[in-house]
Amino acid sequence: MKKILSFILGSVVALTLSMSVANSAAKEVRVAFFLEWPTPNQEDKVKGIYEKALGVPVKWTNFSNGGAMTDAMLAGDIDISYSQGLVPFINAVKSKAPLKLVDIAMEYGMGGTTCVTSNASGITKANGSELEGKKVAVPLGTMAEYVFDESMKVIGADRSKMDVIQMDPEEGAAALVSGDVVMACLFGGNSIKAATAVGSRLLTVQEARDAGILGIDITSVTDKFMKENPGMLRTFIEVTHEANARYAAGKSDMNVIAKDAEMKLGDMKETIGGFKFLTPAETEKSMTSGNLAGFLKGMDTPNGAVDTSFLPL
């Protein structure tokens, strides 16, 4: 009798667990991404490879900055933010946001994120202190703000003496063109191209690299989605790294990526060429003891913000 009861109870528990797993599986996956920020997995996005691997629809929504991605995740509208800037993520977890960093989208120099001064202003690296007292456009709470702060250290200008105006990249580029600001810090190939049509980079890509200014974009996820759908999250990251490997092998469809990024092919190739897409092993090293770990420590990021267990190692 005890054996029968034990079998029945065991069966009930097993059934309950299987139902729980089934019920927790998401009916769709909602992903945030950026336009003008080309990445290999956009080919998979367009060709439905994520849907095939996950078995559910994937809804992609473009955002203007990483802070907006965080807001959407906290509102319950986004599950995964792909290529979110590290700075907005750090700001979020410092405020105890229930988010986790689970992958590195890419590392990059200042080709894709930079500060541009207008030619009309006559301001360059050599006389950068003249930015003080002037209006500058910066998308606050993003990697571009980090680049702004680090660039000001290099040229010896005091941020507190500038009129810093919150503007997303497209707005900042337009303000630079119209003369409303003397400098715009921005990201995204189209916005940078518009800005450099009337201005010049305050620091060249090489000067920024020499100064140790490195950008890192990450993949973040809500704690809720991670706990309820660990298999889906792991699959999403696997597909992403497969796309990166295809790109490294020179087998990506660049025309598809350019079209999805809403960029001209030449501009897209120039932008993506400045990105470094890490292998899973390189990603783990960066997250535990490399560039990412150093960045997190330097910005006093709370412990427990990173989870490497979903990497396809």
Where are these regions (language model features)?
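Bacterial N-terminal signal peptides that target proteins for export
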Residues: 1-9
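C-terminal segment of classical bacterial N-terminal signal peptides
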Residues: 14-23
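Pocket-lining segment of extracytoplasmic ligand-binding domains
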Residues: 164-165, 170-257
